[in-house]
Curated annotation (Swiss-Prot):
Principal location: cytoplasm
Broad class of enzyme this protein falls into: lyase
The gene coding this protein: hemE
Subcellular location: Cytoplasm
Protein name, per record: Uroporphyrinogen decarboxylase
Subunit structure as annotated in this protein's UniProt entry: Homodimer.
Binding site for substrate: 38-42, 87, 162, 217, 331
Length: 355
């Protein structure tokens, strides 16, 4: 049973009545809940201290370290949810893909997947492959109490892009070439990745995660017709795989203004919106029955407190008519952000939206 489910007795579990989960369920909230993508990361001096000398992938596999890093922004900023500290390529590493995260570059895959024979590299993910995730989440839920923990994974398209390109890419030429040139191989690749991603999310939910977010970082590179035909079936498969757990499912990608409706249609309960589309317009594109998450421009955090508050007020005003709203940035926290700016932002949103 997940931390979001009501037990058979009808009594809610610790996180069920949290502002974050209520907003995800489009229920009335005491205040607009706030959390930040990449809230556990390089913007925090305490993060830099505990990560010193430890490679990224190794840090994702040490349960006590993962728990500490995940908790840091909750302690410092009073955010309404924690997000599990990991990286989207962790499940790929766990099944034996030869990859590393290079500082200043990102994930680099030694042998890109571009042929049918290459698909053999993608075996099933088992809970034993990521036992450190289960252990870390057990530690976290014991510490977090009533604060929900968000589990996450990379969406099939974004994982495929890393695997096919061999690393980060601006234009995704190899990825699109495979998608257009060999549609059946592409579909089989995404289907395998959907199975791996689903298994990774199930491990997190069964360990105690209260919600999950599917990050499709690169999907904004696609036209809507290509998304619907070549990507959406795999994302839908992931959302359907975890539907029975009853936890909110969040879907986010960057530059996805033209895809918002389809991303909701794929099976998300909450659609994340970047800073380019006002939330009232995003709601029109997504349609009814979905909560929205977002969408302050992260760059404003480098401006004055007054500017941050003005832009935040614009986001809150645009969200005023929404059924459910989780406040977030429109992308991850930039590494050089002043952490005090984030603490002030959380306090401002809580104060301004107190019911």
């Amino acid at each position: 049973m997940s931390a979001n489910d009501r037990p058979a007795t009808g009594q809610p579990t610790a996180t069920y009545e949290s502002a974050f989960l209520k907003a995800c369920r489009r229920e009335p909230v005491p205040h607009t809940p706030v959390w930040f993508m990449r809230q556990a990361g390089r913007s925090l001096p305490e993060y830099l201290k505990v990560r010193e000398g430890i490679p990224m992938l190794e840090s994702c596999m040490r349960p006590e370290l993962v728990a500490e890093i995940t908790l840091q922004p909750v302690r410092r900023h009073n955010v309404d949810a924690a997000i599990y500290f990991s990286d989207i390529v962790v499940p790929l590493k766990a099944i034996g893909i030869d990859l590393d995260i290079k500082p200043g570059v990102g994930p680099v895959v030694e042998k890109p997947i571009r042929t049918r024979a290459d698909l053999a590299q993608l075996r099933d993910l088992t809970p034993e492959d990521v036992s450190y995730v289960t252990e870390a989440i057990k530690l976290l839920t014991a510490e977090l109490g009533e604060t929900p923990l968000i589990g996450f994974a990379g969406a099939p398209f974004t994982l495929a892009s890393y695997l096919v390109e061999g690393g980060p890419s601006k234009n995704h030429e190899h990825t699109k070439a495979l998608m257009y040139g060999d549609p059946q191989l592409w579909a089989d690749l995404l289907d395998r990745l959907a199975e791996i991603t689903s298994a990774f999310l199930k491990v997190q939910i069964e360990a105690g995660a209260s919600a999950v977010q599917l990050f499709d970082s690169w999907v904004g590179a696609l036209a809507p017709a290509d998304y619907r035909r070549s990507v959406m079936p795999a994302s839908t498969k992931v959302f359907q795989a975890v539907e029975s757990y009853g936890v909110p499912r969040i879907h986010f990608g960057v530059g996805t203004g033209e895809l918002l409706g389809l991303m909701g249609e794929a099976g998300a309960d909450v659609v994340g919106v970047d800073w380019r589309v006002p939330l009232d317009e995003a709601a029109r594109r997504v349609g009814t029955g979905k909560a929205l998450q977002g969408n302050l421009d992260p760059a404003v955090l480098f401006s004055t407190t007054e500017a941050v508050e003005t832009k935040t007020r614009e986001v809150l005003d645009a969200a005023a008519g929404l059924e459910g709203h989780v406040f977030n940035l429109g992308h991850g926290v930039p590494p050089t952000t002043d952490p005090d700016a984030l603490t002030r932002l959380v306090e401002y949103v809580h104060t301004q939206t107190a019911r």
